[in-house]
Structure formats: C-alpha cells, structure tokens
Amino acid sequence: MTSPDLHATRQAILSQQTSPGEQAERCLGLARSPVCAHVFTQLTPDSLTQTAQTPGIEQRPLAGLSVSIKDLFDVQGQVTAAGSVVLADAPPAARDCPAVARLRAAGAGLIGRTNMVEFAFSGVGNNPHHGTPSAWDGRHDRPLGQPGGHVPGGSSSGAAVSVATGAAFIGLGSDTGGSIRVPAALNGIVGFKNTARNTPAQGVLPLSPSLDTVCAMTRSVRDAIVAHEILSGTRVPAAHRPLNHYRLGVCKRYFQEGMDSAAARAFERTLRTLSAAGAHITEIDLPALDELAGLNATGGFSPAESYAWHRELLGREGPRYDPRVAARIQRGAAMKACEYMDLLRGRADWIRRMEQALTGLDAVLSPTVPITAPSRDSVAPGAERDEAFFRANALLLRNPS
C-alpha cells in the first residue's frame, strides 16, 4: 500500500484521525530505517518535532508535515555541502534561502538534508562519498527491481527516495537538465519542473545559472500544485476545459529513440489512457530536435557555467572531487567566449523556431526517460564502469534536457 499524500494526511489531521506529532514520528522512523540508507546526509529530528508541536500548525498549508531539503540549499545553521566532501568544512548558512523560508512559512517540518549527486552534475544518482540510495517504487511501496538495488536517478537522488518511501511529503530539489524529473520517473512519484527563475535561486549552490530551476517532488499531482504555489508564491488557476478540448502532440523522433521495452509499454499505456479520456493526440515531427547535438557540440551551458564557479576550488581540491563530476566540470575550461555567445544566440533562435512549430498544441508528450533504472552495480564508481555510467547518464538526461 502506498503512503498517503500530503493532501490526504492533512485532511486526516484536521479530522483528528492523526496528528502532526504522530506523522513526524512515523517519518523519522522511515528516515532511520534501511529503506532510507544513504538518503540523508543529515537528519534534523528536533526541528521536525518542534514544528509538529507548534500550536495551530495544522492550519497552515503543510501542517507541520515532513519536508526534505536537497543538500544544495541554504538552511540557517547548516553547511551547504552539495553532496561533496570538499565543502564539508564551509561555514554554516547565515539564513534560510528563499525557497526554504517559503516552505517554513507554510508550515513545513524540516526532516533533514538529502543526499545528491556531487554538485548536481549527473542524472544517474551516484555519490562515492555518501553512498548511493537505492531506488524505491513509490507506486507499490517496495524496492525497485532485484536485490542489490537500482540507481535512483539524479541529481536529486535522496530527495526522490525520501518522498517515495514516505519519509517526506515534499522533497525540495533543483532541476537543470532533469534533476527532478529523472529521479521522479525512476521512483514512481511526481516531479514538476517549473519555469526557470520562477522561484528565487538565491542561497542555492549553482550548477548552471542559465538553466537552474528550484522545484520539488511529491507523491501526487495535487501535492505538486501545493508545493509549486508555495515555492513560486503564485496560485495555479484551475482548468475548466474538459480533456477533449486539448490537443497533445507526440514526436517519435529523438524522444523515443533507444527506448527499452518497459519504457515503451508504459508510454503507450499512458497514451491509451489519455485517448480513452478524450484527449486528441496527434503525431508530429520536430526536425529541429536533430540540431541539438550540433548546438551543444562545444559542451553546452552546464560545463562552462559550472567551471566558472568551480575553477579555483577544483584547482585546489580536484583529487577530492568525484572523478566523473570533475571531468564534466573541467570540460567547461575549453569553451571560448565566442562559443558561449554563439550558444546563447543559437539557443534563443532554436527556442523561437520550436515555439512556432508547436503552435496549436497544448502540450508535447514524451517519456521522461527512455530506459528503466540501471542496477547500482553496473554504474558504480570505478574507471572500468565509466563507459556504462556515461552511456546511462546520456540516456537518462536526453529527453528532459
């Protein structure tokens, strides 16, 4: 049986079927159990319990319920280490970042900091410093796949598993090229990437400021709406049109290439469900997708912008970085200023042409990832597995990025 979502749990609190204190105890029990091995880099039980015991907390939108924080966000009094040992001795944050402050104001009980890919630079979910969480099937409340475990996706790996297991109702994370959507897909939960800069990114350690987005994972779409409204400070208007008034596009080019049979079956099942509910689904062709490889031939935004932030730290502490992460950051050193400017112009032109191509459509449907989660052993740290790791990383990040 899957864990109840935030909406259902808050309703149960308001009807006195449970209490914030009982829920805090339950979530802490899960967070300390084997199902959450390597999920948290720091637990804050006192913070969660104190929030749950605050008079009137049940009247706030989050009712004192458990929220996990990716180790990329400033929380007052805590070190923002970004899943790395390099920043372990950095001074604690002087204040909450805006995203955390908004969650607290809405009644969030902070259960702890979640593990992540070092410096958020991979979609697989590995962390050689703190261990790699094992993916959890949030739809059926059980471990995903065979003994030994599967990768949870990244970079918001711990955040996803904290939500899927029920240790948290919301997992605060970030998404640059898939870091919310990939782990949400692999753990059977909901991941919503909003518009970049919709939520302030101050106090969030950057990967690529041009693309970084503050967002969250939840166990239901209705919870995702609540989380988005809190983080963005805006209301989501209700849609009053029936589904048969929406035109949805499906593009086989690019998005479905190299898709394994399990992902293909799941995607086809989704299309059948939407069609049966009245949605108009049209196959479309988007030849501009074939230009992406050329557009990013010099490395793309993430290596260049991350290198700008890391270059001095990498020079001093390079051997202490995850070698796979260091290699991707180091690639940014080779990008010339003219190439970066070409990339900015090329991206703007590509977006303009893509918007024109999508005229008349309400949405484009695609599988979030074209493959199921690889086993942890197959992509574990080690040069002998680098080829398998980078192949999996490229496939997992291809569609969302």
Give, region by region, the residue ranges found by the protein language model.
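Acyltransferase
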Residues: 17-25, 53-54, 97, 262-285, ...
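Short glycine/serine-rich loop segments
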Residues: 95-97, 101-228
